[in-house]
From Swiss-Prot:
Originating species: Dictyostelium discoideum (Social amoeba)
InterPro entries noted in UniProt: CobW-likC_sf, CobW-like_C, CobW/HypB/UreG_nucleotide-bd, P-loop_NTPase, Zn_Chap_cDPG_Synth
EC number in record: 3.6.5.-
Residue numbers covered by motif CXCC motif: 116-119
Protein name (database record): Zinc-regulated GTPase metalloprotein activator 1
Length: 475
């Protein structure tokens, strides 16, 4: 990385901004899509996400102080950082700011003053968005999430019922664009740090056990537009590395480079890019497994390969390989897929390596181990049947590896091959396999308290982490 000292030369960016906005403000206004529903218009929404310090608020201020000609409503977490001259009014635990329509076209700002915009705030967020949409005075709504928020729960808010009625928020609004801002000067280091939010004293609650890398991945994977910000503070090589990795993580996203969060507004407002089903069902790693391969990005210094096998791993041997850390997986930036462990032969192991964090989760049952009446929906059956091969059915190893030029494919494949059952072990059968030492333990039960919490969220997946010392992966 090349360290540079940031210079606040605002004159040139300001001239460039004015030049662009004068020529495009009218076009942006003309192209704003409004869909008639029950006699009123749906309110388009953009959500801004990104880790702390990435430049979200700078982007928001840039939008609010631009001559776009739109009446914009805004929901933020920290009003103090939003540069709007207005009076605060306390209303129902929310601070409401109202300004005249002539003041940069900002009509209302709602500060979520009792917490961040995340899963615990979805009900309040739903109420506030509905209020703004029903006023029918705004052309657009922008939601700025907190730096430790994930985009998915915010997007899910737009499918929730309002006060138990038959009306959904989607009847009043149209989720238009999910924007994530990435700080190119710190993102790779944060990605590979192995730290948790608790380590950095940034957790949302005392029970927040999320890792930093998982948060960064969630913010990037569930976005339509990714703003690579602060490009002026790092080398071209660093920017290309980040671009290459993100292209593999989220190949559908629109990537934009920026300095001081300055970007053409047409790229983030009224794009029409968001599709909830598409965003939630087709992550980049799954596209690789399905053959929708991201082209080799040699120019970015990023490459990928898929490891496949049709026999199970020995749990103890696999654990020993994982413990070797960077001696085997050096250069790997991301790895995910499906694994088959002999000690728990009926269970799918969800393999997940990100940065220096390695986990294997219980992802449910192989279709080959289910009875016909237990089969999932027809579409999923068809997808699984594509990977069917006798005598093992859909049981398999299928792992995507994404990394830099130092990633050693032949070494990784050799080490993983040594973890596969030998012909003699394979003949012993499942009953014997189950008696072997099993450090991974996919069949371990969640603690009752964790189970209750996840069931309340409706997101229980019977997942168990196999935690590995992250320091072993550090370069």
């Amino acid at each position: 990385m090349v360290n540079k000292t940031s210079t606040n030369n605002n004159k040139e960016p300001r001239r460039m901004k004015k030049h662009y906005l004068k020529s495009n403000a009218s076009n942006l206004k003309k192209t704003l899509h409004k869909i008639k529903v029950r006699g009123f218009e749906k309110l388009p929404v953009s959500v801004l996400s990104g880790f702390l310090g990435s430049g979200k608020t700078t982007l928001l201020n840039y939008i609010l102080n631009s001559n776009h000609g739109l009446k914009i409503a805004v929901i933020v977490n920290d009003m103090s950082e939003v540069n709007i001259d207005s009076k605060l009014i306390l209303e129902n635990e929310f601070k409401i700011t109202r300004t005249k329509a002539t003041e940069k076209q900002v009509e209302a700002v709602v500060e979520m003053s009792n917490g961040c915009i995340c899963c615990t705030m979805r009900e309040d967020l739903l109420v506030e968005v509905t209020k703004l949409a029903k006023e029918k005075r705004f052309d657009y709504l922008i939601i700025e999430s907190s730096g430790i928020s994930e985009p998915l729960p915010i997007a899910e808010t737009f499918t929730f019922e309002i006060d138990g009625s038959i009306e959904n928020l989607k009847d009043y609004t149209k989720l238009d664009t999910m924007v994530t801002v990435v700080d190119c000067s710190t993102w790779l280091e944060q990605y590979q740090s192995g730290e948790s939010l608790k380590d950095k004293d940034m957790q949302a609650t005392d029970q927040d056990e999320r890792s930093l890398v998982d948060l960064l991945l969630d913010q990037v994977e569930f976005s339509n537009v990714i703003l690579l910000n602060k490009c002026d503070l790092v080398s071209e090589e660093r920017v290309k590395t980040i671009e290459g990795l993100i292209k593999h993580i989220n190949p559908e996203a629109r990537l934009l480079r920026s300095t001081n969060s300055v970007v053409p507004l047409k790229e983030i407002l009224n794009t029409g890019l968001f599709d909830f089903k598409k965003a939630s069902e087709h992550p980049g790693w799954l596209k690789e497994l399905r053959g929708t391969h991201v082209p080799e990005t040699i120019e970015y210094g990023i490459k990928s390969f898929i490891y496949k096998a049709r026999r199970p791993f020995n749990s103890e041997r696999l654990s020993n390989v994982i413990e070797k850390g960077s001696a085997v997986f050096g250069g790997v930036l991301r790895s995910k897929g499906f694994s088959w462990i002999a000690s728990t032969p009926e269970l799918i192991g969800m393999w997940n390596l990100a940065g220096v964090q390695m986990t294997i989760l219980n992802y449910g049952y192989w279709l080959a181990d289910l009875k016909p009446h237990e089969y999932p929906n027809l579409d999923l059956q068809k997808e699984i049947k594509k990977n069917w091969s006798e005598p093992f059915g859909d049981r398999r190893q299928e792992l995507v590896f994404i990394g830099g030029n130092t990633m050693n494919q032949s070494l990784i494949e050799s080490e993983l091959n040594n973890c596969l059952l030998t012909d003699a072990e394979l003949l012993l059968g499942k009953d014997i396999w189950r008696t072997w030492i099993d450090p991974i333990q996919l069949d371990e039960e969640l603690e009752e308290e964790e189970l209750e919490e996840e069931e309340e969220e409706g997101e229980y997946k019977d997942e168990i982490e196999m935690k590995v010392d992250g320091s072993k992966f550090k370069k």
